[in-house]
Design a protein with these regions (language model features):
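Mid-to-C-terminal functional-domain signal that highlights helix-capping/loop sites
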Residues: 9-385
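N-terminal Lys/Arg-rich, disordered targeting/topogenic segments
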Residues: 1-11
Length: 385
């Protein structure tokens, strides 16, 4: 007779325990609505169940998808607390786990002489932060599936809107909605189309803030020593530890529908092979879909700078790269695989950091152009479903 075997923590019990904890966490989120008497809006599968008027959708319906989560499953972060970035070492020393360290990625914003960092580990669990810097009401938006960061001015006409997470995606990119009181009819706002795509505000643009960077905390702090950093709420701590998209980007697989649009000329991207840098040419090849790029707005079009090219140019002894032909000279300081900080003084152009497949879907070159991502779908008219 064989001896009895006991499952120990080292022998694999940790796997079962981990699975149980994950299951309990999922059940906990699922039961929050029923136990609180609030029914979640959106079934995770059908966009029509999310409570938005889709009848006037101005983009092809094929690119619209439910994320799997209901509306507001990820709660917007409103008017967050901040602290001086120079105090982060002391702040980390007082915590059981460190909040932000040198290699952690952040969204860096510089407005009216004020620098502020929004750690991506925090933005992963909120996807939008309604904030104000130097008197400017802003929405810091981050879409993890497309790794895209856009900071918008929240002033729309005579209103200041406040954004929430809709639970819907377009071209794998987060759709937001404008929150309001009883009787308010919300619109859906696309991060990478820079406008409302459905609802009463359909077609209304949101203006991106210039000079936004995505890089690591160490580089941002070095180039902006007076920066502030946004702090999490206590309820964010556990979710921040368990949320990461690194493996998704490495796999290179896009899990949601993507429709290549056909926007007006001013919203298209000039083929990257025709744009040169001061010390070298941009990649003139088919880029992998998950290549991290910086899209730079010019007067009549956009140009794209791949992060690997900026990194290549940021050689010793200075560690900086200067680019030209992008509407305005830009000086960058890059961190390999993490991003690049804009260090040239204002005014700087609008720069959108994101993954190439997403940018090319929303803002393709007029003829497909150089740099077309592998397996890119055919362009579709944005005139309606």
């Amino acid at each position: 007779m064989s001896a009895k075997r006991t499952l120990t923590w080292r022998a694999g019990g940790w796997v079962i325990a981990g699975a149980v904890l994950v299951t309990l966490a999922v059940l906990g989120f699922a039961l929050v609505g029923p136990l609180s008497g609030v029914r979640p809006v959106g079934d995770g599968r059908d966009p029509a169940t999310y409570g938005f008027d889709l009848s006037g959708l101005i983009l092809p319906r094929e690119g619209l998808a439910a994320s799997g989560n209901p509306r507001d499953f990820l709660a917007a972060l409103d008017s967050p607390a901040v602290m001086p970035g120079s105090d982060m070492v002391q702040h980390n020393a007082k915590r059981r786990g460190k909040y932000v360290v040198t290699g952690d990625r952040v969204i860096g914003v510089f407005i009216g002489g004020v620098a502020r960092a929004y750690p991506l580990r925090l933005m992963n669990v909120h996807e939008v932060c309604n904030d104000e810097i130097a008197g400017v009401p802003i929405a810091v938006t981050y879409s993890p599936l497309t790794d895209s960061a856009v900071v918008f001015d929240r002033r729309v006409g005579d209103r200041v809107i406040t954004l929430g997470v809709s639970g819907l995606l377009y071209n794998s990119n987060t759709l937001y909605y404008d929150r309001g009181g009883e009787g308010h009819v919300p619109s859906l706002w696309s991060q990478l189309a820079f406008r409302a795509i459905a609802g009463p505000q359909s077609g209304t643009p949101l203006e991106p803030i210039p000079g936004v960077s995505v890089s690591n905390w160490g580089t941002w702090l070095t180039t902006h020593p007076q920066t502030q950093v946004v702090l999490p709420a206590e309820s964010d701590e556990r979710r921040m530890k368990s949320t990461s998209y690194e493996r998704y980007w490495r796999d290179g697989r896009v899990d949601f529908p993507v429709v290549r649009l056909a926007p007006p000329p001013a919203e298209r991207t000039t083929p990257i092979g025709t744009v040169s840098l001061r010390t070298g040419a941009l990649f003139d090849q088919v880029m992998p879909p998950m290549t991290f790029v910086m899209a730079v707005r010019r007067a009549d079009d956009w140009v794209v700078v791949p992060l690997p090219e900026i990194v290549r140019l940021c050689l010793p002894p200075t560690g900086f790269a200067e680019t030209s032909g992008l509407g305005a000279p830009i000086t960058w300081r890059a961190a390999p695989d993490l991003g690049a900080v804009i260090v040239s003084p204002p005014p700087n152009p609008v720069v959108i950091p994101c993954r190439w497949f997403a940018w090319d879907a929303f803002h393709p070159a007029p003829d497909g152009g150089s740099g077309e991502p592998a397996g890119a779908p055919a362009a579709a008219s944005p005139t309606g479903p």
